[in-house]
Amino acid sequence: MISALFLMNGKGEVLISRIYRDDISRGVANAFRLEVIGSQETRSPVKLIGSTSFMYIKVGNIYIVGVSRQNVNACMVFEVLHQLVDIFKSYFDNLDEDSIRNNFVLVYELLDEILDFGYPQNCSTDVLKLYITQGQGKLKSLDKLKQDKISKITIQATGTTPWRTPDIKYKRNELYIDVVESVNLLMSAEGNILRADVSGQVMMKCFLSGMPECKFGMNDKVIMDREKSTNGGSAARSGARRANGIEIDDITFHQCVRLGKFDSDRTVSFIPPDGEFELMRYRTTEHINLPFKVIPIVREMGRTRLECSVTVKSNFSSKMFGANVKVIIPTPKNTAVCKIVVAAGKAKYMPEQDAIIWRIRRFPGDTEFTLRAEVELMASVNLDKKAWSRPPISMEFQVTMFTASGFSVRFLKVVEKSNYTPIKWVRYLTKAGTYQNRI
């Protein structure tokens, strides 16, 4: 359990304090200010001062600190702290000192509803907004609500689906799915993959009437292998990688997903919240299809000259394209002049970044472009100066309708008692995480 919560500014001043248990006094905030905020060293997010544990996150100039003297689950505390950030931002867009001071009554109301005696009770923004609302700068409390509305709030807050009200109606029932993946890569100068993984998330925008039951199907390897054995091993041989499914290492679901159903038959079934939400997160490290391959060639011609050739090749279909592609090619700190020739896009030497920035607005699939540069270096008088460390080339990009992991939505079924047929849209997007190639 959490004994106390503090919201502090960058100077260590306490903006909000809520003591949930009597084993903590407000004075412990001063110890945190001296040991963490007052220190110039980089600190871990968990700090033990005496017998008191401080777990904190920093958002802008605001520290959100959970305090406990018990053997508390640190992951639970950090989950609550991050949920607090999301809740505060849903009420006032910017989480800064002025917003907290101007809405301190609202913040205390939220803290009292979210935690009870230090135990998390309600972290659902949708439920909290039913009875803690802010209109025209004044907080509307429960005593101003009608009795029937209070009853509905109670039923929803304590029911099986607190994230969704039953009386939602839309003239046009729509469902949007966005599969967004971030590719992380570290490749050696010889072209060997040293580290590669994909972090993905499935975002949904739900505009459905009533209480729809949704069933989501993905090409998980466990599901695909099970279906193959059920069908006697008969499966289409075309697109073998996609047919065999992908191996998901880690997966996390929204609270609306029935985990028991997923554990038993790997079915993702749920009653979705209204509006936008994150259905699931996943991570995979096997059989990653890299969207771009970088082939760097760097020759040091003596102490004052350097020749550089960087070829970037797209590994996806010619029907697709990469958008806003940016290649950052590092140069030595003593660079004087850069002569650059590119086959596509625009490139410029940026002395403040010690790098050549190559931008290609639209990069077609199954294509390669090359940048060539002659770099003249200033002669160094200091003979003891260290040699150029050759930092890695990094990339930024976005590729639509492509997934590096091979993840795909197989089906999405919606069942509701009014028997409507919703309009469904699916979009895929792959972007660069930490995408680097050593030279």
Swiss-Prot record:
It is a peripheral membrane protein. GO terms for molecular function: clathrin adaptor activity. Keywords: Cell membrane, Coated pit, Endocytosis, Membrane, Phosphoprotein, Protein transport, Transport. One of its GO terms (cellular component) is AP-2 adaptor complex. GO terms for biological process: clathrin-dependent endocytosis; intracellular protein transport. InterPro entries: Adaptor_comp_med_subunit (IPR050431), AP2_Mu_C_sf (IPR036168), AP2_Mu_N (IPR043532), AP_mu_sigma_su (IPR022775), Clathrin_mu (IPR001392), Clathrin_mu_CS (IPR018240), Longin-like_dom_sf (IPR011012), MHD (IPR028565). Pfam families: Adap_comp_sub, Clat_adaptor_s. Its main location: membrane. Phosphorylated. Residues 172-438 form the MHD domain. It is found in: Cell membrane; Membrane, Coated pit. Gene3D superfamilies: 3.30.450.60, Mu homology domain, subdomain B (2.60.40.1170). Adaptor protein complex 2 (AP-2) is a heterotetramer composed of two large adaptins (alpha-type and beta-type subunits), a medium adaptin (mu-type subunit AP50) and a small adaptin (sigma-type subunit AP17). Component of the adaptor complexes which link clathrin to receptors in coated vesicles. Clathrin-associated protein complexes are believed to interact with the cytoplasmic tails of membrane proteins, leading to their selection and concentration. AP50 is a subunit of the plasma membrane adaptor. Belongs to the adaptor complexes medium subunit family. This is AP-2 complex subunit mu. It comes from Dictyostelium discoideum.
